[in-house]
């Protein structure tokens, strides 16, 4: 075969290979096009179903949390959540926080918390024992999850806060600013809707737990004035994030701070902290027109910390060990009361739930049920109430729940920071168990050494 014939033969072979390759590519493209057409057709057929589902979800997304039901009858408390945020924060990106609380809509429960603008085990966690700073913000994450930059959403700039859901949107209340002129910023669905200026210019502050909603209106209690003497206390009624009514309590010799409020049969009951002179807890109950009654829990099973040993109670402030205090809660059932309190009488350690069947009105110290929550050898802290509405649970009553803050770090431990994790429980009329669910983190961290 001469050179020209070789060239022609090689060229012919290359052309055949090229034609075959082109045909294969064309076949592949046709196959992909057919497959895509089938998938697109299937998606188009499914679209009406998908749209119907979305429309249905939107149709049930907005309700009114009536709050007209009574509290559910309960015999004990079932563990609901534990976030383990300090343990996780030794290696993970977890916020330095205090004052966590829980609130539920008709669709979900969320943990709200006041950050310090810092992460655990980081240099900016230094000095976070301070309560009020311009770096503090209210944020929230799904209940039971450790609060981190990856699962949390910003709510408000705040060093004192509250939040609740009326069935349509979240209402948040965030207080920030100087001690002598702080302002509460109200947001509804994330949009600023109103503000409340400090009226006594002495550390305006609010609940550090959820506000309470009834029939589309939400209610909160605020304090302005001395932490160790007579102060001023106001109830605010809000609709879609705007204040529509307020009333100042006529409460001489009473001291209300950090109230834990809940709806019950269309009215609101708040159990608060007396930081002035009471080792039992003051309460205020009111209807939707803000007509109110006030008192102290009469039981000889005292609920504050510090406090004296249980003894004879009073329907006014019990003065022994009455100064200072800690945020707490109770649930009223007729003349009876579930009291949540630290186990220790003089430090924020341990936690227990006690049922006093006559404690709302009676002054003796007898009780019939005690359920352990945290051992006295482990740190606790603030505690507060929240509820789950029938629109969430499907029950015909309002389920009472509570959370406990488990404070770690300064001032009791050798760290540069102060933070906490949280646990929560809900009332049930079935089997429960007492145990200890402590924070469980091993300190100090690397940053502390």
Curated annotation (Swiss-Prot):
One of its GO terms (molecular function) is exo-alpha-sialidase activity. Keywords: Calcium, Disulfide bond, Glycoprotein, Glycosidase, Host cell membrane, Host membrane, Hydrolase, Membrane, Metal-binding, Signal-anchor, Transmembrane, Transmembrane helix, Virion. InterPro entries: Glyco_hydro_34, Sialidase_Influenza_A/B, Sialidase_sf. It is a single-pass type II membrane protein. It is an enzyme of class 3 (hydrolase). One of its GO terms (biological process) is viral budding from plasma membrane. Its EC number is 3.2.1.18. Disulfide bonds join 72-397, 104-109, 164-211, 213-218, 259-272, 261-270, 298-315, 401-426. It comes from the Viruses. The active site is at residues 131, 382. GO terms for cellular component: host cell plasma membrane; membrane; virion membrane. Residues 71-449 are annotated as: Head of neuraminidase. Its main location: virion. It comes from Influenza A virus (strain A/Chicken/Shantou/4231/2003 H5N1 genotype V). The chain crosses the membrane at residues 7-27. This is Neuraminidase. Homotetramer. Belongs to the glycosyl hydrolase 34 family. Substrate binds at residues 98, 132, 257-258, 273, 348.
């Amino acid at each position: 075969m001469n050179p020209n014939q070789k060239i022609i033969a090689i060229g012919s072979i290359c052309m055949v290979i090229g034609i075959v390759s082109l045909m294969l590519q064309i076949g592949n493209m046709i196959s992909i096009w057919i497959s895509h057409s089938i998938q697109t057709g299937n998606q188009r057929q499914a679209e009406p179903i998908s749209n119907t589902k979305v429309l249905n979800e939107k149709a049930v997304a907005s309700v009114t949390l009536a709050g007209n039901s009574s509290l559910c009858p309960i015999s004990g408390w079932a563990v609901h959540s534990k976030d383990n945020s300090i343990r996780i924060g030794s290696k993970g990106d977890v916020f330095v926080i205090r004052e966590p609380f829980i609130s539920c809509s008709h669709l979900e429960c969320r943990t709200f918390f006041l950050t310090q603008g810092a992460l655990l085990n980081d240099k900016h966690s230094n000095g976070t024992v301070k309560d009020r700073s311009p770096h503090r913000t209210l944020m929230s994450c799904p209940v039971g999850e450790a609060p981190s930059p990856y699962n949390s959403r910003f709510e408000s700039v705040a060093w004192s806060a509250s939040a609740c859901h009326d069935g349509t949107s979240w209402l948040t209340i965030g207080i920030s600013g100087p001690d002598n002129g702080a302002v509460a910023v109200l947001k509804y669905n994330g949009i600023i809707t109103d503000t409340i200026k400090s009226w006594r210019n002495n550390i305006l502050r609010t609940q550090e737990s959820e506000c309470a909603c009834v029939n589309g209106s939400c209610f909160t209690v605020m304090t302005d004035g001395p932490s160790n003497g007579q102060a001023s206390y106001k109830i605010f009624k809000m609709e879609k994030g705007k204040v529509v009514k307020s009333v100042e309590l006529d409460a001489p010799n009473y001291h209300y701070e950090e109230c834990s409020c809940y709806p019950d049969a269309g009215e609101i009951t708040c159990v608060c902290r007396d930081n002035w002179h009471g080792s039992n807890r003051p309460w205020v109950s009111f209807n939707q027109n803000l007509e109110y009654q006030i008192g102290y829990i009469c039981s000889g099973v005292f609920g504050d910390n510090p406090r004296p040993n249980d003894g004879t109670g009073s329907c006014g402030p019990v003065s022994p060990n009455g100064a200072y205090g800690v945020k707490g809660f109770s649930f009223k059932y007729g003349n009876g009361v579930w009291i949540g309190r630290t186990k220790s009488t003089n430090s924020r350690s341990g936690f227990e739930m006690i049922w006093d069947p006559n404690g709302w009105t009676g002054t003796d110290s007898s009780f019939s049920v005690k359920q352990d929550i945290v051992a006295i050898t482990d740190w606790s802290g603030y505690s507060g109430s929240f509820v789950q509405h029938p629109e969430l649970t499907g029950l015909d009553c309002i389920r009472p729940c509570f959370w406990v803050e488990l404070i770690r770090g300064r001032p009791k431990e050798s760290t540069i920071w102060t933070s906490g994790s949280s646990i929560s429980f809900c009332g049930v009329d079935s089997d429960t168990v007492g145990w200890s669910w402590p924070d469980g983190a091993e300190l100090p961290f690397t940053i502390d050494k």
